[in-house]
């Protein structure tokens, strides 16, 4: 066993989770105390409109809890909030966890144990998943499309309960693209990975922040920001459509010659239908190209992916000790 882990950071993005926060903090603290190593909990408020930021500030003011509250000025999205937490984290292993308590914080010590065996990334698979049938089907579809498009073989990309070694986190922080999906990005740099089954519970507090439209947008973002496979597929489809159009044109010319101009006039609507199909395919292609160009434009502007409005912490022994060692 390779155990070079001196300390652990836990990063939790929070968005409108005031109902679950007291229980989340209590259970996460209890889990971290079982690690047997110095630890810190970084709670990132992603522009919540409820009392989440207030509760995080209150928790971070207690020096006994080892909590750092990072407050973003507005909502930037789950993965940007996690990157903000990574920027604050100093642990040799960094654990990410959702705030909805569907994945129990009690799994944290087990993830640290696997990371201590030398794995760069410890992924998780939700066993006996308690989501609705729609969410399960949507998740399976997204996972399948990601695996086929990116070539990154993972069973459950949607589960954010994961462990990352320090060098993986550092590598991700050097990536400045605006659209980021952390599990895939981490696997890009990881040499040794593993996936383990973890428990999954029903959501007790609040509602899911991922609606149907957000899931569709997420799938589209993943396919366009992480791979050029859609462009290659589009080129293949364009070639097939062009060849089909050429063959159809030859067929129409032949039928006109053998059956006369009268038949050709009666086939105008068929021709229009085929034309509209080709025009529709062109618009789909233009939209996809526009999405890629828009992402290039966004990345070229190099605007920050988030803005930290305030950081609150009453106890920072982990950060202080690490900085002293580096100096």
Swiss-Prot record:
Biochemical pathway: Glycolipid biosynthesis; 4-amino-4-deoxy-alpha-L-arabinose undecaprenyl phosphate biosynthesis; 4-amino-4-deoxy-alpha-L-arabinose undecaprenyl phosphate from UDP-4-deoxy-4-formamido-beta-L-arabinose and undecaprenyl phosphate: step 1/2; Bacterial outer membrane biogenesis; lipopolysaccharide biosynthesis
Location in the cell: Cell inner membrane
Membrane topology term: Multi-pass membrane protein
Domain of life from the UniProt record: Bacteria
Transmembrane segments: 233-253, 268-288
The EC number(s) this enzyme carries: 2.4.2.53
Alphabetical list of InterPro entries matching this protein: ArnC_tfrase, Glyco_trans_2-like, Glycosyltransferase_2, Nucleotide-diphossugar_trans
HAMAP family membership: ArnC_transfer
Protein name: Undecaprenyl-phosphate 4-deoxy-4-formamido-L-arabinose transferase
Organism: Pectobacterium carotovorum subsp. carotovorum (strain PC1)
